């Protein structure tokens, strides 16, 4: 029998979706949440890192997830996609039987012990992850980790958390960064500082690093540690310098545990903040200031030359490229560049003044949600609409469908005046030629992560 739908196959429904709710001019936007995010869309631009990737920055650390099978699917795939990542990842499945019996502590101790005993080489550090279910049932993690530390005194254990439904105080990213430095213990103080907690090593050419080295300081960069001994050496530092707002709880936790001063020198694109960062570091750490005027003249010279090349090309920026997307937009706009869209879902408190400036002086700047459910259906055709779009960030490249893009993730180690100069060079190179591998690049999870 031939059915009706075989002779007349149903047509694929065509939807007409308006951008209302998913896009808004900054002049009409509210701070700090310009969008109501309910049902969320996840784009295939996946270069940003997650809690499955960041523990791999600790040399010799082995991740063990003790979770329900449904929760494990995502992290298993994330770890397996990373080069050599699967070898540093294990799992213990939480079952209904464990929930009914209430033996959560016993199964976690036995499961982690079994994995450690079967490993060909004993890890120096283990980060064990618990999920929401254990915490709903009040698992006693003190019993778990005290037992494991007594059983394996040669291993440092970190309590990791995959509890997105229990975000009472910290987001998963903030909590994950804090736990990454929990295995660092006090050591006799040396003339040294730490950079915490970035996912990319800080570029050594930047003026802050030069200042510190000229002042006789050793620098322990969390993301640049090659051995577990280098990671543990962070315990000897006098101060923790952090550039990301999300790294604040990690630095303050180390201040409390290790008696190391927390020093916030944020990423920035305005000269006032860049100069203030250096002045603060110089005052607290006893350093000589570099010639900030010379750096600012160099930036102005480079940005003028870049503007002549880029012209009125449409530019879009996204929040995965930089923690200060509005700050970067402001810098480019006041220098005459045609920034027309910024992709973000919320606005950092650090960018409140920048948000208000853009509201007043550039009210037509489009803010676009990356997670709003409409983003799945809205057209991604800006590169055809405007002729050419230059994207800064992977999500901006995907949503505008352009191959002219700067592959930047969380500033990619760029910092300060020197970082801004290098970013301008990257923008210039991206404007010169298409990257034919754009779609392949943006689908690689945790860009730059290696097991």
Where are the regions that the model predicts?
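An N-terminal assembly and electron-transfer interface module characteristic of large anaerobic redox
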Residues: 1-451
